[in-house]
């Protein structure tokens, strides 16, 4: 297991809500005001909200919250509850008539885990927002990771349970942290130990996903790994887009294969803009801490 949680970065709150019986849930990250955010979507089957707004050429740089959830496209309804709670708190992009909360979201497919009919909704989003705390540190089967599984190329029977993971790296005053819900088709590795820790499990042995794909056409598995990399460093929206891109290297180190046509792999990047930092260093640490967070999604 690796140390740290994304709430180690001052000013960040995290809240979870879930339905354990239905096997689905939602996680919300609420950053401090004055933040900057961007995103990099790599998977071939993404499900997202407000990601176009985070393109560096577009208007808004600051977000009110970021949501990760299960429920596939149905789960996008969860962010509405977060938006409504933010409006009550007076948090959002100012417009002549009031405010518009900016809440990007990414979803994962967990509809086949337990219940197809019960998904994250407005009520669950509101609950997660109200549960948000500066002290939140739970990992595993919680929030967006409630229905997450991995190693699905041979079907549900041989897949393994995954969840939500987080980790932090501190270097002097600089902090880089990640939180991720791991719902990958592929195998999961602890990159720093060069050890497979989850994947297709048959007769108590791992079967490499790539070997399976060489023999069969994997069409039925629907997957996605969705995460956030955050830092207290000072960065522009354009720089954060690059940091999100570099952090995807952490996905590639820990998930094999990754970024397939049936994955919706997405990474949001967030800066609280407190300390001077080098983009190359933070992008490299982002990849390292994301790989650690992915491992923790299995360990916890």
Regions found by a protein language model. Name each.
Residues 1-73, 77, 88-300:
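A structural signal for small-residue-enriched, beta-sheet-centric alpha/beta enzyme cores
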Residues 78-83:
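Short Gly/Thr/Asp-enriched flexible loops that form oxyanion-binding sites at enzyme active sites
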